[in-house]
Amino acid sequence: MAYELEFEKPLVELRKKISELKEFTKHRDVDFSDEINKLEARLEKLENDIYANLSPWDRVQIARHPNRPTTLDYIERLFTNFFECHGDRCFGDDEAIVGGIAKYHGLPVTVIGHQRGKDTKENIRRNFGMPHPEGYRKALRLMKQAEKFGRPIICFIDTKGAYPGKAAEERGQSEAIARNLFEMAGLTVPVVCVVIGEGGSGGALALGVGNYVHMLENSTYSVISPEGAAAILWKDASLAKKAAETMKITAKDLKQLGVIDEIIPEVRGGAHRNVDEQAKYIDDVLKRSLRELLPLHAEQLIAQRYEKYKKIGDFVESQQHVSVM
């Protein structure tokens, strides 16, 4: 059964009517082609209206869609000869992060990303895409290996956040995230990051220090979930929709604020509607990003990355004179 989002219910009802009429026409000697054509035209108009006016909360729902493509879905479509590497060489192998070496249009690269499950069993195995410290240390190990061999790094970001459990804290969750931020800032190879779903807090940032950071059109990137923000601000997690409106978590907002570099368009209705087509959109942006970064020397890459993050958070003070009575 198809998973339907809250704002898509009018579309689901209309599609159901069209399907019923087609089925009735197929088994009865009755022609409903005019009615079907009218309903299909109405459906197309309604789809255009809905998807052209998505609210931040609508985009949160799309980013969390259970069928939304994962890192491994994109690896399968964008890379060849992918060889997954395991373990952080300190504690264990965290399956909430996948990474390895691959070829991207013939170019050797290292690709790393958060990985959610496709069903309950896999989600439990991958901890719902929320990494432990060993996941971030595995990612850093692969990044330093990529630096050693001169391979560009491509990171896919999709997590609610780093796992906040007791064991993760005991093994140094905050240190692992901080270490990744520090080390990624100084990598001497090109780093391109793409937010493909949810970009949650430090758990996302630990894979997000790149020369370019891009976001899929319906992905989100924030310091906290809308539910968490609502619980803190208004003591009521049910006000998540209100929080989403004010948090500036969408790709459009973050592009305007200079946090990300480019918005990658999604197929209408969300990336889950056509993964192959969505991969092509990502491919176009990755190719262009690497084409711009590959000619740069190590010092230039580090300087460009430094300037990018130095500008985030800039503000302009108002010059308006205010008289005090």
UniProtKB/Swiss-Prot annotation:
Query: Pathway it belongs to?
Result: Lipid metabolism; malonyl-CoA biosynthesis; malonyl-CoA from acetyl-CoA: step 1/1
Q: Which UniProt keywords apply?
A: ATP-binding, Cytoplasm, Fatty acid biosynthesis, Fatty acid metabolism, Lipid biosynthesis, Lipid metabolism, Nucleotide-binding, Transferase
| Stored Gene3D superfamilies | 2-enoyl-CoA Hydratase, Chain A, domain 1
Give me the reactions it catalyses.
N(6)-carboxybiotinyl-L-lysyl-[protein] + acetyl-CoA = N(6)-biotinyl-L-lysyl-[protein] + malonyl-CoA
This entry carries the following GO cellular component terms, namely:
acetyl-CoA carboxylase complex
The record's subcellular location field reads: Cytoplasm
Q: What Gene Ontology terms for biological process does this UniProt record contain?
A: fatty acid biosynthetic process; malonyl-CoA biosynthetic process
Q: Which GO molecular function entries does the Swiss-Prot or TrEMBL record give? A: acetyl-CoA carboxylase activity; ATP binding; carboxyl- or carbamoyltransferase activity
Q: What is its EC number?
A: 2.1.3.15
**Domain of life from the UniProt record:** Bacteria
Every copy of the CoA carboxyltransferase C-terminal domain together lies at 35-292
PANTHER family this protein is in? ACETYL-COENZYME A CARBOXYLASE CARBOXYL TRANSFERASE SUBUNIT ALPHA, ACETYL-COENZYME A CARBOXYLASE CARBOXYL TRANSFERASE SUBUNIT ALPHA, CHLOROPLASTIC
Task: Give the similarity note.
Answer: Belongs to the AccA family.
According to its UniProt entry, the function of this protein is described as: Component of the acetyl coenzyme A carboxylase (ACC) complex. First, biotin carboxylase catalyzes the carboxylation of biotin on its carrier protein (BCCP) and then the CO(2) group is transferred by the carboxyltransferase to acetyl-CoA to form malonyl-CoA.
- What does the annotation say about its assembly with partners? Acetyl-CoA carboxylase is a heterohexamer composed of biotin carboxyl carrier protein (AccB), biotin carboxylase (AccC) and two subunits each of ACCase subunit alpha (AccA) and ACCase subunit beta (AccD).
Q: What is this protein called?
A: Acetyl-coenzyme A carboxylase carboxyl transferase subunit alpha
Q: Which organism is it from?
A: Anoxybacillus flavithermus (strain DSM 21510 / WK1)
